[in-house]
Regions:
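Structural and coupling elements of P-loop NTPases
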Residues: 1-616
Length: 616
């Protein structure tokens, strides 16, 4: 009979962005008294990265452990966004069950689908938590039906379809097995009990030879690279001589210098660990995700973890604009290269191709969000760099060129559905489903080429006056769609001079389009200062000051009034970029510019490009 470790449960918490997953983990930590009562629990304690707290999303998978009635529950908090799906897949290997958190109003979303599919593929036991039950608009019964439909659609087996449901309000710290909000108890005990009763305990085969697989990486200046993962078999102690089976089939021997266990939000040093434990190991600088650690006399690697390939790439290069070096600490090409290579130490979904010239680096990731988070992180660390427009990665599958397609789910007021359907049809999207979800809202589901979505979210927000919600996730590679993908790109207003933008100049040119800079902003020749109302680029002089004369004008006492400029965020700037433009990123500024700054040289290059296109 198989021996089990009844004192442990390993679970992952999965959910769509913003359905309350991290808040739920915070509450479980608080109610299990894992966190010191004197330390005031920081809201969203599991999101330790500044960007995660600001954006309210989880980017990196985290692990923590809580003790409940003598059982240790290891909880993996996973990202809910497909751009960080590389993290999700690996965590599924470390756990025996999943807690699926679903919003009591929004129900199942594309991300829920993406993450749940990964969990069911690994044969994990699911538990469903319907969160935000206290919302006036909550519809728990319908949401549970939607979840069941999704399980059936994703091919869940009979055991997985018998999932238990707990209803909760994580923010209030209440839960219950009843879907009536009035029955909510001021405790998370129903969730803890359901986890212990339904999630299988890990197999205790600690007397067999060690097998430990690395699922996540961390880096520490004192001990170097750290491999985080699960012991599938055997026992490991500090000082053990072990063998690392590399991805390429080679092996390396090393001594375990430190072992870490997880207690609450802390990582503490331990002396030994056995089958079923989630731990971190240090001692091998060259360790990578998917590799297996075994005893030197019994090398038996586990199957390598497959990581989804990147779907989007962009060029990174050192800043060479006229304002280069003014605002950043790290401005050279070598510094940018070192930082990108350092990112590869922990982010396995990222690819960096240094290219022959070493000046330009092709960086590939899982989506716009994945790459924009990297750019924002580098900017905050004091780097100056320039990036090109994102482009999708074309793959050849069985001799056919294929491009990535995304599954898009849109919730919008009914009156905007016509213009959305038209816009996505122009971008070669196919509508898969359309349903009314009450309150005058329509849910639309499309399959759209990923390149058709680059730059679409800003257009979508203005099209729906900010009332629409769009979520999309990578679906599959399909043959490349012929022809141009719609979504007309408007031209840019390009500065033809260097200096400071003046109110007088902005007043004269604002009727030509939308201005991106405030009066007094320093600009340079070739910098984009606005969006043209037409499709062509237009050179403008934004630095002219009003001529002073000693003649009193009849309009002398009029005050200059200009429209508020549209200051672009990092994501909006990326979406605005055209093929011949760069986004310049520094710790203090985000600027858009033409790759060729001089207008005459730019015109010559465009002519050459046009001739070459005609010759083809």
């Amino acid at each position: 009979m198989t021996k089990l470790r009844e004192d442990i449960r390993n679970v992952a918490i999965i959910a769509h962005v913003d359905h309350g997953k991290t808040t739920l983990v915070d509450e479980l930590l608080k109610q299990s008294h894992t966190l010191d009562e004197r330390k005031e629990l920081d809201e969203r304690a599991m999101d330790s990265n500044d960007l995660e707290k600001e954006r309210g999303i989880t980017i990196l998978a985290k692990n923590t452990a809580v003790a409940y009635n003598g059982t240790r529950i290891n909880i993996m908090d996973t990202p809910g966004h497909a751009d960080f799906g590389g993290e999700v897949e690996r965590i599924m290997k470390m756990v025996d069950g999943v807690v699926l958190v679903v919003d009591a109003y929004e129900g199942t979303m594309p991300q829920t689908r993406f993450v749940l599919k990964k969990a069911l593929e690994q044969n994990l036991t699911p538990i469903v938590v319907v969160n935000k039950i206290d919302k006036p608009s909550a519809r728990p019964e319908e949401v549970v039906d939607e979840v069941l439909e999704l399980f059936i659609e994703l091919g869940a087996d009979d055991d997985q379809l018998e999932f238990p449901v707990v209803y909760a309000s994580a923010i209030n710290g209440t839960s219950s097995l009843s879907d009536n909000p009035a029955d909510q108890e001021h405790t998370m005990a129903p969730i803890f009990d359901t986890i212990i009763d339904h999630i299988p305990a890990p197999v205790d085969n600690s007397d067999e030879p060690l097998q430990f697989q690395v699922s996540l990486l961390d880096y520490n200046d004192f001990v170097g690279r750290i491999g985080i993962g699960r012991i599938f078999r055997g026992t490991v102690k500090v000082g053990d001589q072990v063998t690392l089976s590399k991805l390429d089939g080679t092996t390396k021997n090393f001594r375990v210098t430190k072992l870490f266990g997880f207690f609450g939000l802390e990582r503490r040093e331990i002396e030994e660990a056995k089958a079923g434990d989630l731990i971190a190991i240090s001692g091998m600088e060259d360790i990578f995700v998917g590799e297996t650690i075994t005893p030197t006399d019994a090398v038996e690697p586990l199957p390598v973890l497959r990581i989804d390939e990147p779907t989007l790439q962009m060029t990174f290069l050192a800043n060479n604009s006229p304002f280069a070096g003014r605002e950043g600490k790290h401005v050279t090409s070598r510094k940018v290269e070192e930082r990108l290579l350092a990112e590869l130490q922990t982010d396995v979904s990222l690819r960096v191709d240094l290219g022959g010239r070493r000046i330009i680096k092709k960086v590939s990731g899982r989506g716009e969000l994945h790459l924009s988070i990297l750019i924002e992180t580098m900017r905050r660390e004091g780097y100056e760099l320039q990036v090109s427009r994102p482009e999708v990665i074309i793959k050849e599958i069985d001799g056919v060129k294929c491009e990535p397609f995304e599954r898009v789910q849109i919730d919008t007021p009914e009156e905007y559905q016509g213009s959305i359907i038209q816009a996505l049809s122009e971008r070669k999207g196919d509508m898969l489903d359309m349903q009314m979800v009450g309150n005058g809202q329509t849910r639309l589901i499309f399959l759209v080429p990923a390149r058709g979505l680059i730059g679409f979210s800003t257009e979508f927000l203005s099209m729906t006056r900010g009332y629409g919600i769009m979520n999309h996730t990578f679906d599959q590679y399909l043959p490349v769609v012929a022809g141009e993908i719609g979504g007309g790109h408007r031209g840019a207003l390009v500065s033809i001079d260097t200096g400071k933008a003046t109110t007088y100049s902005i007043m004269r040119i604002e009727e030509r389009g939308t201005i991106f800079v405030n009066p007094g902003t320093e600009v340079y020749e070739g910098m984009i200062v606005g969006e043209n109302a037409r499709e062509n680029d237009l050179g403008v002089n934004i630095t002219t000051a009003k001529q002073m004369t000693n003649v009193r004008s009849a309009t002398k006492d009029q005050t200059a009034v200009i429209k508020t400029p549209r200051i672009l965020t990092l994501e909006e700037s990326l979406e605005f970029l055209d093929d011949d433009e760069y986004m310049e990123v520094t710790p203090e500024s985000i600027r858009l510019r033409k790759q060729i700054l001089n207008k005459a040289e730019r015109d010559k290059a465009n002519k050459r490009k046009k001739k070459a296109a005609e010759a083809e």
